Amino acid sequence: MTSVKLAEKNFEQDKEFAKAMHGDSYKKRGISALMAKAKEASDVATNGYFKHWDGGVSEDDEKKRLDDYSSLTKNYYNLVTDFYEYGWGSSFHFSRYYKGEAFRQATARHEHFLAHKMNINENMRVLDVGCGVGGPGREICRFTDCTIVGLNNNDYQVERAQYYAKKYKLDDKLSYVKGDFMQMDFEPESFDAVYAIEATVHAPVLEGVYSEIYKVLKPGGVFGVYEWVMTDKYDENNEEHRKIAYGIEVGDGIPKMYKREVAEQALKNVGFDIEYEKDLADVNDEIPWYYPLAGEWKYVQTLSDCFTIFRTSKIGRTVTTNVVGLMEKIGLAPKGSKQVTGALEDAAVNLVAGGEQKLFTPMMLYIARKPLDAK
């Protein structure tokens, strides 16, 4: 396993910074939440994130990002969470789509499919690694009636997840914990199941986060993950391929994108038995997973989806960038907000390119089990 320096746990400092930057904006959504940020603290987060992205793709550049994985990811989500919710909703992941199926329905089905493949039930205590603002957890809780603990390294997202759980009267089943998934503070063998939806990609080394998941799972417990990986078609030495991977990294707060084979080997190395693996982005679906970003209107299924697809399309993203730029100019939005939307635009363009060329998948599904006789 590649050697990575684990982050210092400065939880109180993180909490104070989140409070200074976000205040009570966790009770708001979208642009209104953005307008409620403390501008000086937002400037600190912007500088803290973009200092890592100057176009450098050398081994030294990558090592700096890998070593600063925790701060990089925290700053990223301090900056983009409100934009994500505005454009995409509270489940920060991609999905497969079928004709006649609305965007929100597809999102829920993608979450249900994972829970189904893992056989999650009401008697299980489940860990959601990298839980975001809790959208998938709320859906899986309703679907299975299980108890879920969400783990997140971003205080603002933890606050939002707690707020939503209480709002939707699920706080008896859902709880959220601040923590670094590379060094979890849970007791060993304390969960019946663990899942991660497009979250462990933020780990500097996949073997590191998978080993922590293995540790907290009970013997016989199941781990399910939708992993972001570069496919077998990706060539690290191909300049165009590397440009696409870098665009995904800078726009999505990822220290380094790894290939599929790295994820598979990492699971095996820590002791998991892989029971199921499938790239759900490579099954010849009529509607591609990236269509909302590509703005392919022919695939829009419902009237309500028109608003979502407009916001996520090239035209909608351009409108958002210009509006946010104007708000920043007149002091309604924090300094650097337009730079953030620019990074999200880079991400969208390269995610689509990676999807079209089948170089990248956001839904490499693994179902893996910790052996019953694990020590």
Swiss-Prot record:
Q: List the disulfide bonds.
A: none
Any single GO molecular-function term of the entry would be: sterol 24-C-methyltransferase activity
Q: Which GO terms describe its cellular component?
A: endoplasmic reticulum
Q: Which SUPFAM superfamilies match?
A: S-adenosyl-L-methionine-dependent methyltransferases
Query: Do the record's keywords include Lipid biosynthesis?
Result: yes
Family to which this protein belongs = Belongs to the class I-like SAM-binding methyltransferase superfamily. Erg6/SMT family.
Q: In its UniProt record, which GO terms are filed under biological process? A: ergosterol biosynthetic process; methylation
Q: What is this protein called?
A: Sterol 24-C-methyltransferase
Species name: Clavispora lusitaniae (strain ATCC 42720)
